[in-house]
Amino acid sequence: AAPPQHLCGSHLVDALYLVCGERGFFYNPKGIVEQCCHKPCNIFDLQNYCN
């Protein structure tokens, strides 16, 4: 798995598209920005936001 990284703005949205694919994702900016932009997150954290 990829190492945890900081993902903000469009990078974060792009990562969600990659991880979630056709399932789509629930974009809750407050939660995910706190988890993935302010702090590094990994692919498993991102999967929690998939539909």
From Swiss-Prot:
CDD domains per UniProt: IlGF_insulin_like
The entry's keywords: Carbohydrate metabolism, Disulfide bond, Glucose metabolism, Hormone, Secreted
Keyword Secreted in annotation: yes
GO biological process assignments: glucose metabolic process
Cystine bridges: C8-C37, C20-C50, C36-C41
Main location: secreted
Gene Ontology CC annotation, any one: extracellular space
Superkingdom to which the source organism belongs: Eukaryota
Keyword Disulfide bond attached: yes
A GO molecular-function annotation: hormone activity
InterPro entries, per the entry: Insulin, Insulin-like, Insulin-like_sf, Insulin_CS, Insulin_family
Similarity comment: family membership: Belongs to the insulin family.
Subunit (UniProt): Heterodimer of a B chain and an A chain linked by two disulfide bonds.
Function recorded in the entry: Insulin decreases blood glucose concentration. It increases cell permeability to monosaccharides, amino acids and fatty acids. It accelerates glycolysis, the pentose phosphate cycle, and glycogen synthesis in liver.
Protein name in the entry: Insulin-2
Organism per entry: Katsuwonus pelamis
